């Protein structure tokens, strides 16, 4: 840096109104200073503005005098901080460091949750560069169930132990009732293109095979097989075959009735509308049945459905299936196959599910999200949503409510 120049940081605060930044920068322009960095935030009409500039040493006194006079006229607070060249250079050198985004999400957020998350970041020697609210302004009436709160932290640095960081965030989320996502802030985070959903207990608030079993009068037997599978006594494929066999003789009209009355998960309509509007490819990868997946495909304009095909003869289920069983391994393979067909990098993919057989696709996707999931799934997922509806996925993708309001989506 030239010997006859100075680096000065000014910090400005006060009641925000149009024209403040214009007035300050116009004063600086009279002295031909170079703006090296600038940042501004507005919280409840209170301005916080910072400007780092380089000025000729001979001009510094006059610059500061005029700025103080300007601040007095505007009724704002202004402070100066001289910056040493070596401090500035150290700051410049940090620009290549890893960057991450921590997203906190819930019906509402409190100080304890934010303190817990930021303490974990600090213990991992990560620095917060910026904070922004993604959701709209929070009404004081907490009885409104649709209220959501989401804050996004821009974080810089290299975690001391990323696995430990992830584990601590997960435990904090469970204990304090807050959802989180911790992602690397790179080009892929802003360019996701393919999203794959499990169906049962994810897009819909039920397990279809349980509904079918109840109608067939074999509900208890099917539940027992499911419990055996969860205990690890039989694998998914074997449990699937046994459960399907018990559905033999069920009339197809029952399937139609169930499909027409599927309980759609909170937030699905909003999520699907936004994803389609922004050009995402959407897939259902389910260990359930194609009949119901195709119903949702027509309802929401979903692009791909891969599930299990029940065999039907003379309008009744035979107790058999056709084709390959879609288990956890197959889901991961299908996600990669669709990405290849759509010419999408695997880092641009998202997977969302609730069960153990979703873990393979959650692991292989660029962004894997456990949704209202079983404890084992939450413990092994990188991100989870447990407090709000499925449209919470939008905040993990960086969408702001204001973006959607502008387009009449909210």
Listing of model-derived features with the role each one plays in the protein:
Residues 87-96, 184-193, 226-252, 316, ...:
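Long, charged amphipathic helices and adjacent flexible linkers at domain junctions
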Residues 20, 113, 203-206, 358-361:
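Short glycine/serine/threonine-rich phosphate/pyrophosphate-binding segments
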Residues 1-192:
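A conserved regulatory-domain signal marking ACT and ACT-like small-molecule sensing domains
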Residues 22, 26, 65, 69, ...:
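Solvent-exposed alpha-helical segments within well-ordered globular domains of core cellular machineries
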Residues 105-107, 196-198, 285, 352:
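Short hydrophobic segments within beta-strands
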Residues 187-237:
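Active-site neighborhood of HAD-like aspartate-dependent phosphohydrolases
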Residues 249-410:
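C-terminal cap/substrate-recognition subdomain and adjoining C-terminal extension
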